[in-house]
């Protein structure tokens, strides 16, 4: 830059000298006619050529500087490429590009039941949700609870789900049986409004868990809506060895006992917002392959109702849940040779049971304490064991009162009148605190 300034300074000085020298030359060689002499012309021409050469040299030197800087910059870029080559992004999802979430609940309970010692219990149920992509999801739940001197950890369900479109979802793995609405929707202890679970739909008639594949979804029908769930899974096992349970179905079959698979499902209809009715079914062959029970067939059916209403007259919200189920197993002969000590015993197995529950919460009251209370009444029923040698018919009536500390934290108190036919009562006081997260 100093050199450039010197060139400019030289040009200015030369111009000044030319301006001073010109009058002198003209005074010495001036002509009387006013024209420039040949000598003056040659001097001016020489000065102009010298100035042009100097300006060309300055321009050339200025143009070389950006080229040098550009070359240095390119060299730095090339060096970066050699030291840190570009990262190639993989086509599939990477850890950090997916979404992972933990939900679930924890609960503690006290139970004092007639005929049994009172006891405390607790459990923790984490639910793991993993979104591998907007269409591919994984969900799993564990049940962790103390047992004796150790801890029991049970896998409740684990399912991989693919969202095909707005109306069809595909799933495979271990999942809640769609025909059992209570287990699928209300089984979580911070959602279940009473400390214990109803008869029949939880244990006895309906399946809780299925291992297989399912397709489910929903769609509008004019102003109404409908939903569906269809599945194929390992079927139930027919109990044949114990007289108390002979003819009943065991749905805890994580491996099948024959090549025939259970095919079941549920269809729901919502005629108006807040009201849903449903029908569930599961036909199967529950007998062991290669035995006299191999061709015995079973059918489980259920109906359910779910109503939610806000009432200005009652200043609160009313919930009504109900489900009733029936199971039937074809005629069969149990212990045909008497080797088990209770046969031969021949019968067609039929059993039924269900529950109805109504809850009221005064959500429109002005006082916070009253708004957080909820009153519950439930009736549940289970018919006797089909063999006539097992559990008797059982009917229960339960009154409960809940206090909600937050939308997912509740303290419950309930008293249950439990009257198995022909046996002494098993009435119980139940207390529970549960928190969902």
List the predicted regions and their residue ranges.
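Bacterial N-terminal signal peptides that target proteins for export
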Residues: 2-12
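Periplasmic/cell-envelope proteins involved in peptidoglycan metabolism and beta-lactam response
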Residues: 2, 23-24
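Outer-membrane beta-barrel pore domains
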Residues: 158-163, 171, 185-192, 203, ...
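Glycine- and other small-residue-rich loops at beta-strand/loop junctions that grip anionic moieties
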Residues: 204, 252, 256, 347
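N-terminal periplasmic/intermembrane-space "pro-region" immediately following the signal or transit peptide
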Residues: 24-110
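Outer membrane beta-barrel
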Residues: 88-238, 259-263, 268-277, 352-365, ...
């Amino acid at each position: 830059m100093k050199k450039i300034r010197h060139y400019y300074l030289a040009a200015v000085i030369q111009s000044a000298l030319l301006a001073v020298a010109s009058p002198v030359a003209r005074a010495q060689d001036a002509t009387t006619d006013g024209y420039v002499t040949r000598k003056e012309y040659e001097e001016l021409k020489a000065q102009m050529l010298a100035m042009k050469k100097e300006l060309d040299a300055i321009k050339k030197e200025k143009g070389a500087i950006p080229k040098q800087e550009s070359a240095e910059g390119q060299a730095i870029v090339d060096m970066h490429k050699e030291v840190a080559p570009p990262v190639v992004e993989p086509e599939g999802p990477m850890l950090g590009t997916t979404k992972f979430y933990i939900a679930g609940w924890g609960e503690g309970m006290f139970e004092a039941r007639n005929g049994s010692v009172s006891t405390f219990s607790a459990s923790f149920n984490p639910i793991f949700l993993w979104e591998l992509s907007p269409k591919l999801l994984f969900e799993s739940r564990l049940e962790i609870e103390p047992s004796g001197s150790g801890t029991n950890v049970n896998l409740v369900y684990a399912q991989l789900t693919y969202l095909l479109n707005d109306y069809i979802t595909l799933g495979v793995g271990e999942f809640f049986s769609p025909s059992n609405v209570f287990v699928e929707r209300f089984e979580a202890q911070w959602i279940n409004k009473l400390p214990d679970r109803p008869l029949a739909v939880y244990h006895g008639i309906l399946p809780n868990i299925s291992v297989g594949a399912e397709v489910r979804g929903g769609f509008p029908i004019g102003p109404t809506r409908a939903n569906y769930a269809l599945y194929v899974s390992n079927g139930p096992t027919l109990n044949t060895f114990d007289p108390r349970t002979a003819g009943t179905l065991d749905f805890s079959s994580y491996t099948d006992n024959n090549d025939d698979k259970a095919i079941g499902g549920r269809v729901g209809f919502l005629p108006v917002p807040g009201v849903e009715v449903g029908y569930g079914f599961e036909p199967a062959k529950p007998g062991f392959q290669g035995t006299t029970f191999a061709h015995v067939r079973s059918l489980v059916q259920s109906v359910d109702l779910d109503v939610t209403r806000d009432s200005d007259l009652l200043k609160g919200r009313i919930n009504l849940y109900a489900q009733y189920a029936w199971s039937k197993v074809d005629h069969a002969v149990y212990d045909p040779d008497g080797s088990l000590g209770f046969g031969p015993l021949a019968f067609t197995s039929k059993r039924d049971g269900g529950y109805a529950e109504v809850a009221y919460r005064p959500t429109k009251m002005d006082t916070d304490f009253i708004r957080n209370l909820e009153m519950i009444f439930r009736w549940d029923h289970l018919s006797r064991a089909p063999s006539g040698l097992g559990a008797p018919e059982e009917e229960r009536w339960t009154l409960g009162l809940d206090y909600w500390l937050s939308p997912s934290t509740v303290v419950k108190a309930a008293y249950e009148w439990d009257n198995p036919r022909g046996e002494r009562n098993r009435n119980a006081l139940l207390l529970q605190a549960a928190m969902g997260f």
